[in-house]
Amino acid sequence: MNTLKRIFVVVLVFVLAEVIAISFKGNDILDRSIVLGLGVDKAGEELLVTAEILSPGNGSEQVGTYSKIVTARGKTVAEAIRVMTEQTGKETSLGQCVLVVFGEEYFTQQDFSDTISYLSSSNSFKESSSICCCLGSAQDLFNKTEALSRSVSLSLVRMLREQAQNVAIPSNVLLQFVRSQRELSCTGYLNLIRYVSSENQDVQNPDKPQGFFLYDSVAVFCQNKFVCLVDSDLTKGFALIANKVTGNTFICQQGSENVTVVVNSKKVGVSLNEQDGVTIKVTLTVSRARADSVESGGIFSSKQRKQIPQETMDNVQKQAEEQIQQFLRYQQQYNFDIVNLHQAYRKKYGSKPWVCQLSTTDIPITLQVEVKAR
């Protein structure tokens, strides 16, 4: 019986290998430029599209795969990508694209509904792709590969997807952004990226540029049109009431020392109250900052586990309330909603026109913040 099972497994593996071999031809890859990231800039009456592509070498090119930056112009992103295909002699494939970046002049001056529609309606483009905007041009951003010594697209995606929750920065993907521009208040946000040059410490390559990305701010949009920027200080308040975002830090005076307290987990509730206003209830679970994030233990563990005094907890609560209130006032000032205030009304009244048209300025908000020790 065991022998029959082994034979069956071998035959099954062989059949699967044949099916894959038939449906996946080497020429399919050789004829394609696989796009890792796209950048879109305004260039007069046209768009300048920058792509970081991963393409197998052929002809006189180096054997193997490599990443390079390619640019093309067009009236639309679709046209620019077609031009890109003509320039490279290979089909431009968006199926593996993980990042889209809008340059400053493009996202602040132009309605980019056509670009969003093109990407979201594409069968091959991933709805989970990260989408963001940047200060300066997207073309310049993608040309920072040398300074980073690695792929710009993969570096940014890793930051936005993996690190964002650890450093209290909300992040967005294509599907979420598309929905935010069509539902309720039709407002949403994109992470704002900026490149910061740093001093070169490499003695062997003193002329090589070096730097890093900062992504501590967001830009707000309504129906794919720019509304305002939310700076790093205001983004702290936004992060405190954004679900699945942790890592906010607070500096508190504790006796004769400054203590850093970090948010490890939280619970956020947004609901209507009896006065038909919105109550935002935030429960933060905090602990003193540790030298490591995996909590594997060590000689300092017993000291780090000591309880946080109530005075420090009260200080954290006060700081958190101030940061959230500051952000909420800014929301009302520019009349946008990226913290689900309108969603609270929809749960009770449905998607009625008055719910969607309700001004954020007219929504009374009650904030409740509770801080617990881990």
Predicted regions located by residue number:
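Membrane-proximal alpha-helical signals and transmembrane carboxylates
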Residues: 2-374
